Amino acid sequence: RYLYGSVILFVKEVSKISIKSAALSYQKLFDYEYQFTVVRNRNTQPINICIRFDKSTFHHLCGLHKLKDIEVVRREKRESVFDKIIDGTYSDELFQKSTWYDEILDRIDCLEHLEAILDDKDTIFKFNPSANKSSKIDADYIIKNETLGLRYYFLVSQNDTDNFFFGRSCFTRGQNERDFTIGHTSY
């Protein structure tokens, strides 16, 4: 068994988790926009959420900013790091050397499944910053999916310049852990 966050996985499953695989899965989304229309009730206006994906957001979504002891990740432009992950210049072994690697495993797992999470979303929530006081996340909406005994969360924020949404954070929690969406308004 192996513990990341507080989700316990078997070693066999952890060994399958790969930053390159997550990057390749994420890259597939570059040619797509996910559009959702949500309505709270019949007295409110519908809200359109259109999500776009690009290289620059992968870095934070994957948690690479947490790997403070991997110098190349800290120095290089985010887009360049993404390209080097894709072309194999930066291997999974490089990232696995980090003291903080275990802290990003749930993010990598979430990104590997992001397309399925968005296709099979369970619920969309309006993000309420006061619902999770210990969190520093700044987002507009939470997209939640539950599968295989795990809860996947993908948080999005609206871009001020073009009104499209982008990924702000993603992570996974076990069914026996507190649901991150408690205190947020569901649609």
Q: Each predicted region: which residue ranges?
A:
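An acidic, glycine-rich, mixed-charge low-complexity segment common to nucleic-acid enzymes
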Residues: 1-144
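Conserved binding-pocket/active-site segment within a compact domain
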Residues: 110-187
